Swiss-Prot record:
Gene3D superfamilies found in the cross-reference section: Plant lipid-transfer and hydrophobic proteins
Signal peptide: 1-24
GO biological process: lipid transport
Keywords: Allergen, Disulfide bond, Lipid-binding, Signal, Transport
UniProt-listed InterPro entries: Bifun_inhib/LTP/seed_sf, Bifunc_inhib/LTP/seed_store, Plant_nsLTP
Task of the protein: Plant non-specific lipid-transfer proteins transfer phospholipids as well as galactolipids across membranes. May play a role in wax or cutin deposition in the cell walls of expanding epidermal cells and certain secretory tissues.
SUPFAM superfamilies in alphabetical order: Bifunctional inhibitor/lipid-transfer protein/seed storage 2S albumin
Name this polypeptide is given: Non-specific lipid-transfer protein
The keyword Ligase appears for this protein: no
Paired cysteines (S-S): 27-74, 37-51, 52-97, 72-111
Organismal lineage: Eukaryota, Viridiplantae, Streptophyta, Embryophyta, Tracheophyta
Single GO term (MF): lipid binding
SMART domains reported for this sequence: AAI
Protein source organism: Pyrus communis
Domain of life assignment: Eukaryota
Amino acid sequence: MASSAVIKLALVVALCMAVSVAHAITCSQVSANLAPCINYVRSGGAVPPACCNGIKTINGLAKTTPDRQAACNCLKNLAGSVSGVNPGNAESLPGKCGVNVPYKISTSTNCATVK
């Protein structure tokens, strides 16, 4: 019984000493979360709730400057690769979902300046 407690204590100490590793946001995460937004950025109209949920998810994952820059680059690439995107619709999307994104969703955004 005592050895079980020692093992548990050792595991707790090891976990406390572990260095946390930052995981950058991936473009596949951004694409998957924003797939419900495609029709809106092409045609306008009502923003689907699933789209806003995706934007909120991505914004919530972007806690650090590198994460925000990675998300920005993914959004910039998506905006340029999806055919028929209306730039105004893409730019207005965060505001319509009540999300404060610290950069413009545009193919001209300089993501290196995002903090």
